[in-house]
Regions:
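Absolute N-terminal positional cue centered near the fourth residue
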Residues: 4-5, 25
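Bacterial N-terminal signal peptides
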Residues: 5-15
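N-terminal signal peptide c-region/cleavage motif recognized by signal peptidases
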Residues: 17-19
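N-terminal, motif-rich segments that launch catalysis or mediate targeting to/interaction with membranes
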Residues: 21-157, 164-296
């Protein structure tokens, strides 16, 4: 069992949607740092060397910072032309309808045209892109530049598969149209709470959080079990958490249509997020070890 250290005050204080860390920032950094614990030594050396050679200035070039690169790249022109947003936004999620999930419809597994790199090829969901980038990272023919892009996208997209609100939709734009509050705090969206607020209660510094979670995985000896499966399996697992907990345990609506999250919902959500961070870190490491191992 993973170690949980929940501060009692977390269910008494207000959960305010003020910080913009989101899974895009703090969560991604935590997951990358967890993965760093489990990289084979030779693979870690390759990862560090590839990132050190990165000339892009959007982020720093340590593994935690590079885990945010795909989001920063996507959002560069969000308020202008939105060309990057239009091309890559669907790469970060899998929109499975809560009442009738259909993986084949959500992820159609398009084939990359011959000679087309994964960074330019078609895909309609995160599962497809993870599979494409993992294959490219292990390729003997892909250029160094394309392999670097594959690594940077994997650092981000594997994490996205494990955020329950990124792989589910209840006709509410993935939780963006559902307003909630906790402990009497100001309303925010359900997606924001799962993106950011619940993670914030684990702490402010991603490294000690990642170290603690990785230590919990070691003590529980669950790495091998966690690392099994495919991106599709992991997506359906996260979808189950969305259906059973994120949506399934919401209280009755208030008269204004929003939800007041009870203390047990908040506590359980933080524990669920912690588990998903662990799973994502372990599985990211497994993908990188496979793609950049003896055959990578």
């Amino acid at each position: 069992m993973l170690k949980y250290c929940l501060i009692p005050i977390l269910v008494a204080g207000a959960l305010l949607p003020g910080k913009a860390f989101a899974w895009d920032e703090e969560g991604h950094r935590i997951i990358a740092l967890i993965a760093d614990h489990y990289l084979d030594p030779a693979v870690k050396q390759k990862v560090d060397a590839m990132l050190a050679a990165d000339k892009d200035t959007l982020t720093q070039h340590d593994i935690a910072s590079e885990a945010v690169w795909a989001d920063a790249h996507r959002d560069l022109d969000r308020k202008k032309a939105q060309q990057r947003l239009a091309v890559t936004d669907s790469w970060h999620s899998v929109m499975l309808e809560l009442d009738h999930p259909d993986m084949k419809s959500a992820c159609t597994e398009p084939t990359l045209p011959a000679g087309t790199p994964a960074s330019q090829g078609p895909a309609d969901c995160a599962v497809d892109k993870v599979n494409q980038f993992a294959a490219e990272l292990s390729s003997k023919t892909a250029s160094a530049g394309e392999k670097l892009l594959a690594l940077k996208y994997l650092l981000n997209l594997v994490a996205d598969l494990h955020q329950p609100l990124y792989v589910s939709d209840d006709h509410n734009d993935g939780g963006e149209q559902t307003l909630v509050s906790g402990g009497g705090g100001e309303p925010g969206t359900l997606r924001h709470y799962w993106d950011s607020e619940f993670i914030d209660y684990l702490g402010d510094d991603p490294k000690p959080i990642a170290d603690d979670i990785a230590d919990g995985v070691r003590q529980s000896k669950t790495f091998d079990k966690m690392s099994k499966g495919t991106p599709s399996d992991w997506t359906l697992e996260a979808f189950g958490l969305a259906k059973e907990h994120a949506y399934g345990k919401l209280p009755a609506k208030r008269p204004d249509g929003s939800y007041e999250l009870p203390p047990d919902y908040v506590t359980d959500s933080i524990e669920t997020i912690r588990l998903q961070l662990a799973r994502a870190g372990v599985r990211l490491a497994a993908i990188l070890n496979h793609s950049l191992g003896a055959k990578g």
